[in-house]
């Protein structure tokens, strides 16, 4: 997502500009779990990754290859797991990655929104990113 754009693309750059080509083909949607549904998430927050024996590269390295391999391993071997709960490397906020098998447990009250400058500019401002 855009966290990766800010975190990895703008490192050490004085001018942090998000151009339309980076966001115009994308959309966003709000969703929640359906009534009576709950997600089973593998909690990678705090020291859990270390307790599970997961290498730190999986959750902290800017090259996402290790994390993608780990997620694929979880997806293929832990069929009861709907996704991953992890801390953002950028903001330290909690993030959830959900797998496609989770879609039947999710509902969305609205249609996807195409990302626009009007939507993104206030969201990106705290990180000194100008949205064109």
Identify the residue ranges that each predicted region occupies.
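Near-N-terminal "mature-domain entry" segment
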Residues: 1-4
């Amino acid at each position: 997502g855009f966290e990766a754009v800010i975190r990895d693309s703008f490192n050490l750059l004085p001018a942090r500009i998000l151009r339309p080509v980076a966001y115009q083909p994308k959309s966003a949607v709000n969703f929640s779990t359906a009534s009576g549904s709950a997600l089973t998430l593998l909690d990678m927050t705090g020291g859990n990754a270390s307790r599970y024996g997961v290498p730190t590269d999986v959750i902290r390295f800017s090259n996402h290859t290790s994390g993608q391999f780990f997620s694929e391993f979880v997806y293929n071997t832990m069929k009861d797991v709907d996704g991953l709960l992890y801390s953002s490397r950028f903001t330290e906020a909690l993030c959830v990655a959900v797998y496609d098998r989770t879609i039947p447990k999710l509902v969305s009250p609205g249609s996807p929104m195409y990302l626009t400058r009007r939507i993104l500019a206030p969201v990106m401002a705290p990180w000194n990113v100008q949205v064109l």
